């Protein structure tokens, strides 16, 4: 009897403890208020002068920890200067001159005076911050986000005036510090100096207290390239929820990439029996097709840097519409060709398709075909974990019963010895192609990974490196002599150090551009100028350009060789010299690549070592 009473009292105590626990949680939730945008701005202000990635990661982790799942999703996007992931895009369509009008309206100051202040400060955000005005409002993160989305949506007659008024009202409701960062987001000049990979690190620190979750988070991001969605999923659920993230038609997969080796012999020694495909100098596309709604099928074309390029390819849209499938994700190389000779055109001709207006005319002027080389998803089934050879067979079956002229499966050939690979390579080069991509037969498709499952073998021109490098423009030098009136005479480029999330100098380029291209380059750079060196650029004092540029422009560079350098930062350590390009020459822009897809310092190091392979 006594024992039963004791058990009853223990049960009552446990029950009361549970009830009190949930009441406490409920009370805390009631007390919780929306995150104010001022908190985000204060964090950005702390991050701005910091160059160390670990400290930036710590500050971001603390910010995400305080946010709700929905707020964390917004903060992740805003911290990269965007409202939406790249595959949706962010377009405010408001020029700085109209932003200035909003500031004039806000501060009731002469426009000429504001322009003078901006010229002195070099940043409209700093000018806003310097003018202290009082506001009784404290807008939440959600409030600011909704207003920015509204700003993006306004269009049509009188839209600019409406945007100016909306901006002026928004600034008036913000404190000056918050207004500074909002203005920078709108102009695409946030410049916090970190990428999506730093956000992934910060999420790991937030959840686990270390970077142990980085690989899990990165794998999820690679198959679902939406950093906001990754952030929200982790905050809402758990690591298990992240592990369950999967391929979704309409959300691009971060493409797999190929490594380099200098010779056919080296590749065969690495892979053994393998398959080789011609390497085409075209526009790599990831095609997403959803025909589950027969009346309104969706076909989208994503570039390798995840931008939606669907408007460029009306002809390919019609071609893919003919495929008898429910849904599909595949990859291919779109390349322009001369319809009279059927010969392929250089990349710079293919890229002329990229325009906002006159797309139908461009399609007629620059006809193209697409050569598919991989399939990632078909009729509800992921194909990522299928071996390469099975994926290729699936691709061939998909097109075996069709005769769609614009869509073809890229040629591939089984290779059983190094000589056969060398002969196939020479045949590809003789046909005017770049070379080969050689693939391991049992390789799974690994999104976002660059490894030796795929290996590039490219033609080598006498006295030149066997490959071009994709470099990022970091700044430019004032012109002298003939180029004085251009205002630019040379420019500084760098490569990407993924581990440090930094861009390291590798060359100063002064050749390879026509007069028109010099003017075009300066125009591109002048939209990205910054008065101080961006903190994600590593550059020796002796190489300091006259004008710094926010790293956003990727260009193709050819050089005679790679040399060791005491000045350039690429690959440089306390014990080792850096690397530099000898006789670098500009070959064209790579608008299909993001700066994070540029050549890395590790690749430069391997290219340097490959020069000594006979």
Question: What would you call each of these model-derived segments?
Answer:
Residues 1-5:
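Short alpha-helix boundary/capping segments
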Residues 429-433:
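Detector for conserved single-position "signature" residues within domains
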